Amino acid sequence: RIQEGINALSGYAEIFQRNIMASGVIPQISGIFGPCAGGAVYSPALTDFTLMTEGTSYMFLTGPAVVKTVTGEDVSQEDLGGASVHASKSGVTHFTAETGEEGLAIIRKLLSFIPQNNLEEAPLVNCTDPIDRMDDLLNEIIPDSPNKPYDMYEVIGAIIDNGEFLEVQKDYAKNLIIGFARMNGQSVGVVANQ
């Protein structure tokens, strides 16, 4: 019945309104652990971070059967909107995990770096690195020639606390490294060219 379709659209509008109202106020993290299709896929795209599980989660507006009917093209759920597609091509997902348990662990780790709301500071963690720690790698890694490349992952690992780095969108724009780390126990954002 047509009125049920209208009610569904109204429900989506309410969800999107809540996404917008919460934006910049609380962290919004979408965990996609199974199929997500139709209007429901817009909400994860509006959240701050999205995680998908490999092989079990899919996000697309219209599934493979409709694509086949309309275009004649055979496409799998994975190729249409699987975790690897959204991690490497569309950029909609920020993290991928092999299992749901691994996905939840990544979300917990992410939450350890960011404030719970816009009125709080990011969590401060006791730093176990010595305050006067020196890493000779930093004296050697950057080559004398400005045209010779070097690995920014090594630089990042050498300067952050305990080498702990949570990379965001690691499969998207491979020339760019973004993520979270800590320096002296304080959360920092990292942006680097690779």
Please annotate each region the language model reported.
Residues 1, 23-25, 68, 86-88, ...:
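Gly-rich Lys/Arg/Thr-decorated short loops/hinges at beta-loop-alpha junctions or inter-strand turns
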Residues 4, 67, 90, 110-111, ...:
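Short amphipathic alpha-helical patches
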Residues 95-156:
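Terminal amphipathic helices with adjacent charged low-complexity linkers/tails
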Residues 147-194:
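Non-catalytic terminal/interface segments that mediate subunit docking, oligomerization
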Residues 34, 69, 106, 122-130, ...:
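A sequence-level detector of short, solvent-exposed, charge-rich linear segments
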Residues 48, 74, 79, 129-136, ...:
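Acidic-enriched, low-complexity/disordered segments with a strong bias for Aspartate over Glutamate
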Residues 7, 19, 117-118, 126, ...:
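Detector for Asparagine
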